[in-house]
Amino acid sequence: MGVDVLFGNAKFTGRNTLELDGKEIKFRRAMICAGGRPFVPDIPGLRENCLTSESFFELTELPKNFMVIGGGPIGCELAHAMRRLGSEVTVLQRGDKIMDKDDPAAGEIVLDVFKEEGIDVRFGSELQKVEPRDGRLCCTIKHGDHEHELVVDKIMVATGRIPNVESLDLEAAGVEYHRRGIKVDKHHRTTNKRIFAAGDICSPFQFTHAAYAQAEYATLNALMPWPYRLNAKDRVMSWVTYTDPEVAHAGPPYSEIEKQKANLDTYELPIKDNDRAQTESEHRGFCKIHCKKGTDKIIAATIVGENAGEMIAEMSLAITQGMRLRQIQESVHAYPTRAEIIRNTATEWKFSTLTSSMKSMVGVWFKISRMFG
């Protein structure tokens, strides 16, 4: 294919030059995809005694007592997995809720499951220090004005990710960045017009599928002339938290939905109203669709339930293509499937469009029909 693959440590030396292990390389275009890494808080004894999402899967034995720092998606996923494998699990969460970037109703459902299954979630709690003790780890935890100790076998840190910007000498290339990563425009171009970036090093969406999508657009934009460049801001992002039940979302994040709620109409159905869910004794979850106020144009959606991650693809497609609830309501979904809850939620919108006079007319029509057979 004519692609040269060079291994080594690279850093920029100018706006169109970089150094790779002492060798200078010139470029017309460059792409930065250096990724990110788990953030480990600066807590005495933690860094040398913790697991992260990158080292967690190196475990070869099941720890009896397992502590997770952070109640976000990764923390909740691994806490749930370890509990079902048999560990006693404690989650330390500094705030007052888990999965605080998702719809609060979703977090409440997952929290209820955690409580039922014996996961100890401690809100308003912060780790102060970690000390090895007799082959285990003694953790000093602060809750309010009080401190106490908890001895565990393993500690998992799930407190977010940070971009790998330190060793690249971005200043030499005129590439601006901040604590969340490299600054990019809608075309994924940095402040140096020759250099583009994609993935965890520049994105608020730190998912594998997000990095792939961004790299796709960034590469095309780096190679194409200006009029043909693709607008990455137009892409709809979706994501899934793999707890049980799963939590899936498509569209702007919940924080944006909350800001726009005065301009949105929301339609919702509980998963227990879905026949397939009933046959499998599933009662936790919901489908919630947000539309532009006064219309059926879909803005965002959240689905909580078994296989929610599979169902959210339909909503991601609908939002991307500017579809409306009318089109979903008119489509025929197979019965009995969980995905049918999406169409039934769209039917809730359909019912909401019936005015009182229309309902009265329908009632009169039924009466007349019964009178005359």
Where is each model-derived feature located?
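Glycine-rich dinucleotide-binding loop and its adjacent helix/turn
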Residues: 34-94, 117, 171-191
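FAD-site-proximal beta/loop scaffold in flavoenzymes
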Residues: 48-63, 149-228, 329
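Short loop/edge segments at beta-strand edges and connector loops
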Residues: 7-9, 14, 34, 52-54, ...
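Rossmann-like dinucleotide-binding cores of NAD(P)H-dependent redox enzymes
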Residues: 57-58, 63-67, 73-148, 204-212, ...
